[in-house]
């Protein structure tokens, strides 16, 4: 899989084709994060082939639909459980991100894993994604934004026209001192 652009969340439901031996086959539902529905179907068959003993030729996709965020204007903390293959083996990992949507948090995770661990998108498997309350977050880079009186330094000051003179002796210093 190539994780290009913002990843979207898809709910894919599939099953093994019914036969005379097994007329009622169970349905399998997965949450897949992919750039489009074609890649989502492909990832669904990839995971199902690993978990159950059938593949695309002996199965069918019953439904595929994109899952939209219920409140995309409220920032949330997301916990992501994943496993990835590195050069030294397979590792389990838990990561936390702050984002507006689940897709945005998972996209951040893929970018972060590529930057920090050189993990390619095809070697990352998302196990579980969950929204976490502020009290249950563990990572410092997420906890630092839970302060209600948080202040950000003004790195570059802006000189307003009303306060400055028409001519100046020197170039204005806008950097933070």
From Swiss-Prot:
GO cellular component, one term: cytosolic large ribosomal subunit
GO biological process entries: cytoplasmic translation
GO function terms (MF aspect): structural constituent of ribosome
Alphabetized UniProt keyword annotations: Ribonucleoprotein, Ribosomal protein
InterPro entries reported in the protein's UniProt record: Ribosomal_eL20, Ribosomal_eL20_dom, Ribosomal_eL20_eukaryotes
Any Pfam family matching the protein: Ribosomal_L18A
SUPFAM superfamilies tied to this protein: RplX-like (SSF160374)
Recorded superkingdom: Eukaryota
Assigned protein family: Belongs to the eukaryotic ribosomal protein eL20 family.
UniProt protein name: Large ribosomal subunit protein eL20
Protein source organism: Drosophila melanogaster
Lineage: Eukaryota, Metazoa, Ecdysozoa, Arthropoda, Hexapoda
Gene expressing this chain: RpL18A
């Amino acid at each position: 899989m190539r994780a290009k652009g913002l990843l979207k969340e898809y709910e894919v439901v599939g099953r093994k084709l019914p036969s005379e031996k097994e007329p009622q086959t169970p349905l399998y539902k997965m949450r897949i994060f992919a750039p489009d529905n074609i890649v989502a179907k492909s990832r669904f068959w990839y995971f199902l082939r690993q978990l159950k003993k059938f593949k695309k030729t002996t199965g069918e996709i019953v439904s595929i639909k994109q899952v939209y965020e219920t409140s995309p204007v409220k920032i949330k903390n997301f916990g992501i459980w994943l496993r990835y293959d590195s050069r030294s083996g397979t590792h389990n990992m838990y990561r936390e991100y702050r984002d507006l949507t689940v897709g945005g948090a998972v996209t951040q995770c893929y970018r972060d894993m590529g930057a920090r661990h050189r993990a390619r998108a095809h070697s990352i498997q998302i196990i579980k994604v969950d929204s976490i309350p502020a009290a249950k977050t563990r990572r410092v880079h997420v906890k630092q934004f839970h302060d209600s009186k948080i202040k950000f330094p003004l790195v570059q000051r802006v000189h307003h026209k009303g306060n400055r003179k028409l001519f100046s002796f020197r170039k204005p210093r806008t950097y933070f001192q």
